[in-house]
Amino acid sequence: MKSTIARWSMTLLAMGAAAQVAVKAQDLSSSRQSVGQPSKDRIVIGLGAAVTPVYQGADDYRVLPLPAIDIVEGRFFANFRNGVGLNLVDDRALTIGAGVTPMPGYRRRDVPTGVDRLSWGVGGRVFANLTGGGVVATLGATQGITGSTGGFVADASLSYPIILNPKVIITPSIATSFADGKHMDGYFGVNAREAAASGLDQYRGKAGFKDVSALLNIVYRLDSRWSLTGSVGATSLLGRVKDSPLVEHATRPNGFLALAYRF
């Protein structure tokens, strides 16, 4: 079994970012219809599904059931992008937080015969969200800390929520990520034993920018509690990582749909 991590794909990371930004936009939309400063506390829970490659660069797709979660209670948060943790700084323009987040890999049946699977782990994450001029900029970093995890991934994104009307919010986003050599080799590498068993060429991953994504997220508020969220986008691998024998397509589209309830 490989001893290094695979984090959430950039596809799912971007979806989580857009969903969080959309919730904040809903807060803004609601505040325009109310008096005084609304509380940031919220509990949003739902269920969705992502249509995404079985791993980054794969030819095959899978439908992956996913929770839709965005909880803020005081300094505590739990959401799809940043995991579970505490907001250390939280005001209108800047949020800085830290927590732990799952770091999933890929199944043995999803990769060529002879290539090991990557098992789940847990990573420590820190992030900062900066809001200004209607744009939400996010910087984050995740380090594997438990299980068979290891390696470091940094990510950055820009989102621009647009309130079309009280019911519809669209959020275009772009994102990119950088990974160290340990992560790159763990996810995209093929060692000598795997090469002999699979017939693939050996490949050793090195540190560098890993991918870039573009996403369009749409939220439709069914009523004051229920909302429907849909996302469509694409992720492209960058640089040397495209030379990995595991990569069949450098650019792959993806989608996400969820129904959520706000308590």
Label the predicted regions.
Residues D41, Y61-P67, R92, L118-G124, ...:
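Residues that define the transmembrane beta-barrel architecture of outer-membrane proteins
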Residues M1-K40:
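Cleavable N-terminal export/targeting peptides
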Residues A49-T52, R109-V111, G140-A141, A195-Q202, ...:
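Extracytoplasmic loops and strand-loop junctions of Gram-negative outer membrane beta-barrel proteins
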Residues D41-L47, A78, L94-A98, A137-L139, ...:
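Transmembrane beta-strands of outer-membrane beta-barrel proteins
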Residues G48-T52, G83, T101-M103, G140-G144, ...:
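Outer-membrane beta-barrel pore domains and translocons
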Residues D27-R42, G57, F76-L94, T131, ...:
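Short loop/turn motifs that connect adjacent beta-strands in outer-membrane beta-barrel proteins
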Residues L66-D70, L158, A250-F263:
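Outer-membrane beta-barrel "beta-signal"
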